[in-house]
């Protein structure tokens, strides 16, 4: 019976049925085609491009040359995300897509500083996103929260302006802080004081780290600074056994995103990709989309990739990584327990 179940997990219809948690999803990289067109219309931008031409600008090629080519895709959508109305709609759209993918809990991250070209304040940008999340929660069977993201290449004075948001917006949907960007030229150690000030406020922290070759020190620095989760963390594979053991003991969660990790050239071949190796060691790995539109993916497709790459990765393994994600989610213990119970029940039903 067990073998039969493990073969079932390879089928896309079984994967579609699985309840899922997603911790690492960027708002601006995850808009649907229909909503990109609606956002353009709202912004008074007359798009003469065909759907194929829009996708060519919004999606990175499967074989992206480098990280820069991948990041250029964000330049296309950012001008559309400069008003309260459009940010609210964008947030709603991403949660709607997630709900259709049977995601029951999602955290969506975005950099408020990227959305101020039409005179929104940082506070208004965050409130717009939260409004979209709340509206989607009312319409779909999903819980959604927001993370504020700082960009490492921005001046520290600008990044410090994000801190008061956690005092001004006491909304339960604003649950954490992240930093993304060029970790090679802006290593984690440059932001020790900033993260210290965030942690003093009692804010949950996840940090992008360990995406580039020889960037594993950023992972250790992130943990030392108080991050309970690491965005991507591919170079965890290069850490010593003692360092990896420390991550297991601290229950540090890795937010991995297979499609994106290959497109950004964090790895270039499957043998280098450490998802299964780290999972087998007991490290708390999770699966995420990173950017639904830019990577032309959804969470079910990421699960299908893992099933294809590691045929022995069973239904119970997928259940386990979702429990890891629940444990790492920036929510209260009571809500975590509810999700744990629900997922245990639903995965049991799928396996029968």
UniProtKB/Swiss-Prot annotation:
Residues flagged as site, Important for catalytic activity: 232
List of residues binding substrate: 26, 28, 181
Positions bound to Zn(2+): 24, 26, 208, 290
One Pfam family named in its UniProt record: A_deaminase
TM segment ranges: none
Cofactor(s) the protein requires to work: Zn(2+)
GO biological-process terms attached to the record: adenosine catabolic process; hypoxanthine salvage; inosine biosynthetic process; nucleotide metabolic process; purine ribonucleoside monophosphate biosynthetic process
Cofactor note: Binds 1 zinc ion per subunit.
Keyword terms, alphabetized: Hydrolase, Metal-binding, Nucleotide metabolism, Zinc
Gene Ontology CC annotations of this record: cytosol
Taxonomy, superkingdom: Bacteria
EC number(s) per entry: 3.5.4.4
One GO MF term attached to the UniProt entry: zinc ion binding
Catalytic residues, chain numbering: 211
Family matches, as SUPFAM superfamilies: Metallo-dependent hydrolases
Catalytic activity: adenosine + H2O + H(+) = inosine + NH4(+); 2'-deoxyadenosine + H2O + H(+) = 2'-deoxyinosine + NH4(+)
Cited function: Catalyzes the hydrolytic deamination of adenosine and 2-deoxyadenosine.
Family affiliation: Belongs to the metallo-dependent hydrolases superfamily. Adenosine and AMP deaminases family. Adenosine deaminase subfamily.
Protein name listed in UniProt: Adenosine deaminase
Organism whose genome encodes this protein: Lactococcus lactis subsp. lactis (strain IL1403)
